[in-house]
Structures are given as C-alpha cells and as structure tokens.
C-alpha cells in the first residue's frame, strides 16, 4: 500500500491529537478515518467497536493504522500477530519523530519454544492452540478471557468449563500431546494449561535445541517465555485434570 501525502497528513494530525497515547484508525477508500482507542494499556490500541462498524459501513477497510508515541515504526510482536489475524496491511506512524512504515501480512508466527508472553495472544492456552494446529493438525477454538480472570470466584472457570467444547475428555495417564490443567499458585480457578511431551522433545514445525527427559512438558507461565522442562513434583501436585483430544488417536 502506498501512503499519499494526504493520508500521511491526516494520520500525523491524529497522532498529535492523541499524544502521548496511541492513535488508531483505518483507511477506507483512500481516506483515513480516525477512531477512538479504548485500550486500557497505554502502549496498545483497541479500536472502539462503534467506530469500526461505522468505518466498515463506508467501504472495505484497506489498512489498519496506529501510532507509536515516543517510539519507532518498528512493529511489536503483538503488531506482527495482529497483522496475520486481520490479513490486512498495518500502518505504523512514529511520533513526534515522524516516520511511516507499512507492513503487509507475511505469514509471521511466534515459535512454540521461546515466545514472549502476551495475554490472550501468547499465553498458556494460545500455546496449546498453536501446538495442536502445527504439530497435530487439530484446530482448537479460542475463548475470550481477561487477564486475572482466575482470581474472581464468580467468574466462569474458563479452562474447566470449556474443555469438553474444545473436544477434550479426561484420562488417567498422560500421553504425547495431552493437555494438563493446573492451578498456579492458589487461585479461585485452575488457570494454567501445559502440553505433555513425554520423551518426545523435538517439534515437527520448528527447529529446537535438544531437551533430555522422559517426562517433558511444554508450557508458558504468566509473564514468562514458553519453555520445555521436566514434569516434576512442582507440577504434578498442581495438576487437576489430564485431558486428551478426541482427534489425537487419528494423528
């Protein structure tokens, strides 16, 4: 996508208006449509649903736009994920050091081992979904979840309530690919899921360093990178369910 001088001027004006917060908007019919940013995070953006709906009524969205206050035009990891999810160009404007960069969908995907933590997009369940997709060829549904949901006793127990809907059933002994649900640490609801690798540490979808053991797991703790490690007492004592997907036997 080529940015015209008119588009750049409109985006710069919106970035200036929203500074020090991120501005956001969309490009429709070669026009920049500014939108409200309703994200609770100062370094992120979320387009107001009403603004997005109004923009879509005006025509096809050609690109999504946001600014990086006091930053560069380099796409963050979350930006790269969102570009692939939306399958649309992503325009980033740095401010006040004005610069523009357009990113096209390129097939980016975070590694299974060593990915950074981003709630919902790269958390423990997102890792399970990606593992099942890449390693087992199984598509798992996603579930809306806010950070810290497990601390609210009145909140639905997302992992426990939804595993049957995702095609899982309970078993007694884990085998390769099973999902284990854990409680970390003391919480109102079980809040962590891990993947049982057993003695099969190597992945088909990416190159990884050797990892030795016969009770290996793959998981991602809150705020940490995803890792493979031994399933020791620190995890066995926290495991509340061992789950197998109904389609695993066909893989």
Cite the ranges covered by each PLM segment.
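Short acidic alpha-helical/loop segments enriched in Asp/Glu that coordinate divalent cations
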Residues: 138-149
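Second-shell loop/turn segments in exported
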Residues: 112-118
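...with weaker cross-activation on analogous glycine-rich loops/strands in unrelated enzymes
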Residues: 147-225
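Eukaryotic regulatory protein-protein interaction regions
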Residues: 95-97, 207-208, 222, 246
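Conserved beta-strand-loop surface patch within small alpha/beta domains used
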Residues: 1-63, 69-107
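Active-site nucleophilic cysteine motif
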Residues: 118-135
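N-terminal pre-domains immediately preceding structured catalytic cores
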Residues: 118-119, 123, 153, 190, ...
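Glycine- and charge-enriched low-complexity intrinsically disordered segments
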Residues: 222-251
């Amino acid at each position: 996508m080529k940015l015209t001088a008119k588009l750049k001027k409109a985006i710069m004006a919106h970035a200036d208006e929203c500074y020090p917060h991120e501005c956001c908007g969309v490009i429709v019919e070669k026009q920049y449509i500014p939108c409200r940013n309703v994200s609770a995070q100062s370094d992120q953006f979320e387009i107001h649903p009403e603004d997005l709906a109004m923009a879509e009524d005006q025509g096809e969205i050609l690109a999504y736009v946001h600014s990086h206050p006091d930053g560069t035009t380099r796409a963050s990891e979350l930006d790269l994920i969102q570009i692939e999810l939306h399958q649309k160009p992503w325009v980033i404007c740095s401010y006040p050091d004005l610069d523009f960069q357009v990113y096209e969908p390129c097939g980016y995907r975070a590694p299974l081992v060593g990915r950074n933590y981003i709630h919902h997009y790269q958390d423990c369940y997102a890792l399970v979904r990606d593992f099942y997709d890449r390693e087992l060829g199984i598509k798992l549904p996603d579930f809306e979840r806010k950070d810290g949901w497990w601390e609210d006793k009145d909140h639905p127990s997302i992992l426990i309530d939804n595993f049957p809907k995702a095609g899982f059933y309970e078993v007694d002994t884990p085998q390769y690919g099973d999902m284990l649900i854990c409680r970390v640490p003391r919480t109102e609801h079980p809040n962590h899921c891990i993947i049982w690798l057993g003695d099969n540490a190597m992945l088909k979808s990416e190159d990884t360093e050797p990892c030795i053991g016969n009770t290996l797991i793959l998981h991602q703790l809150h705020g940490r990178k995803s890792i493979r490690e031994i399933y020791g007492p620190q995890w066995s004592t926290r495991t509340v369910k061992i789950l197998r997907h109904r389609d695993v036997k066909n893989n």
